[in-house]
A protein has these predicted regions:
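Long C-terminal interaction/binding lobes of large macromolecular proteins
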Residues: 1-4, 17, 21, 33-35, ...
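A subset of solvent-exposed loop/turn segments in beta-rich extracellular surface proteins, enriched
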Residues: 1-11, 40-66, 111, 115-119, ...
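Hydrophobic or amphipathic alpha-helical targeting/insertion segments
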Residues: 9, 14-17, 22-25
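Exposed, low-structure sequence patches enriched in small/polar residues
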Residues: 15, 69-73, 78-104, 111-415
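Hydrophobic, small-residue-rich alpha-helical packing segments that form membrane-like cores
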Residues: 18, 26, 32, 36-89, ...
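Short coil/turn connectors at secondary-structure junctions
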Residues: 29-30, 159
């Protein structure tokens, strides 16, 4: 909606369209767009019905290969946008359907999720600027349910901002490819208020604080009743020089969760505290980054668990067209709930932030070679060594040993 029609530049093999699209300026300030897509999607077919959609794009085994191009999806739609001065208003409509009925096996918490053959969404979006205020929002309807998202941004002074966001996504709203602001990745079954502020009262300092109050009108995974939660964050950034910066980030989250072994009859609040310190130093062609994370998790009336990690990364861009990046991580957590995340540089157009639990080391190295303006070659190698287990994974992914290695290569050709 905000950026209009654009190419698909990610390695994601699911969230994209394949077809034709065009935008025409009907009159000054008025644009009309149309698009059509027809593509095959991986999945599982049982009794001439689609029972699940396979989104990874991996076809390593016979079972995974059987899911290739299991059904087709056709999609068509359009958008009309008017923009003049400080006002922007648009309307978008989309209609899509499968060649088979989509009937997934849904548990109680997911009983209102998308199912059927034919779907549609219609939405209206707006943006208005007035002095230091910016108001944006969207309202949409689907085959069932509706969703609302409104945001008010106030630039108080230079370096001072205030943001208020409200969202309401009904429990039965269906929008297959939609992504929106919220606690969940999909705009469904959520209501909440988000308040954030940013301030730079001192030279080289920047402070950020946010508070998110959310609720789920229907059940969620491992929450067998309507529930609510709180997510708060505070961050302090200090940057005394152009090539030197550091920040401290604290995050608190409270949610509800079923107690294991009670079949959802007992639900208690859980509390999570995350603390991160990061130092970045970038002299000339070198960049050094140090990250320390701490995570504490506990459920009411139960003993808590904790985890921490230490990560050091180093990257260097040589005068000739080679860039090298290495990173090492040591992690130690009590269980999965106290897991930690460590982001890594990866292939182009990918975002890689793996989680770790248990005890061990992670090492990765990435080399990029720009042959010329046309060819670019990139290779990445990583290895994780666990100190608390003798086997990794299960089934076809079982590794007999405590070491797990991965190798990725990419060749880009610009025409």
């Amino acid at each position: 909606r905000n950026s209009g029609i654009r190419k698909h530049s990610s390695t994601d093999e699911y969230n994209y369209f394949r077809g034709a699209a065009a935008t025409v300026e009907v009159i000054p300030a008025l644009q009309l767009s149309g698009f059509y897509s027809h593509r095959s999607i991986d999945g599982v077919i049982e009794g001439n019905e689609i029972t699940s959609i396979y989104k990874t794009g991996l076809h390593r085994t016979e079972k995974e290969a059987d899911k290739v191009n299991a059904f087709t999806l056709q999609l068509m739609g359009g958008n009309i946008t008017y923009e003049k001065n400080n006002l922007k208003v648009g309307m978008t409509g989309i209609y899509y359907f499968f060649n088979r009925s989509y009937q997934p096996v849904l548990r109680t918490y997911a009983k209102y999720n998308l199912q059927g053959n034919y779907f549609h969404n219609v939405g209206v979006d707006y943006k208005y600027r007035w002095n230091r205020f910016t108001l944006t929002g969207e309202a949409a309807m689907g085959k069932q349910g509706y969703s609302l998202l409104n945001q008010l941004k106030y630039n108080i002074l230079t370096g001072y901002q205030l943001l208020i966001v409200h969202r309401y996504y009904s429990h039965n709203y269906w929008a297959m490819f939609a992504r929106s602001f919220g606690e969940s990745s999909a705009p469904q079954n959520e209501n909440g208020w988000y308040l954030a502020t940013e301030a730079s009262p001192l030279a080289h300092w920047k402070f950020f604080a946010s508070l998110d109050l959310f609720s789920f009108p229907w059940w969620k995974y491992r929450i067998s009743k309507p529930s609510q939660g709180v997510d708060g964050m505070f961050q302090s950034l200090y940057s005394p020089k152009r090539n030197l910066s550091m920040y401290v980030n604290y995050r608190y989250k409270r949610k509800e969760r079923d107690v294991a072994g009670t079949d959802g009859k007992v639900i208690l609040p859980t509390y999570q505290h995350r603390l991160r310190y990061r130092l970045t130093y970038s002299p000339d062609h070198l960049q050094l980054r140090t990250t320390v994370d701490y995570n504490h998790f506990h459920s009411q009336g139960q003993e808590g668990s904790q985890g921490y990690q230490f990560t050091q990364s180093c990257s260097y861009a040589f005068s000739f067209p080679i860039k090298i990046s290495v990173q090492g991580t040591y992690f130690h957590t009590d269980d999965y709930d106290s897991r930690i995340y460590a982001s890594e540089k990866g292939l182009l157009y990918t975002f890689y932030t793996p989680s770790f639990y248990g005890q061990g080391f992670r090492f990765s190295a990435c080399v990029r070679y720009d042959v010329n303006k046309v060819f670019m070659f990139l290779v990445k190698f990583g290895q994780t060594i666990y100190e608390d287990r003798e086997n990794i994974g299960s089934g076809n992914d079982l590794i007999q040993g405590n070491k797990k290695a991965d190798l990725q290569m990419q060749l880009r050709i610009k025409i």
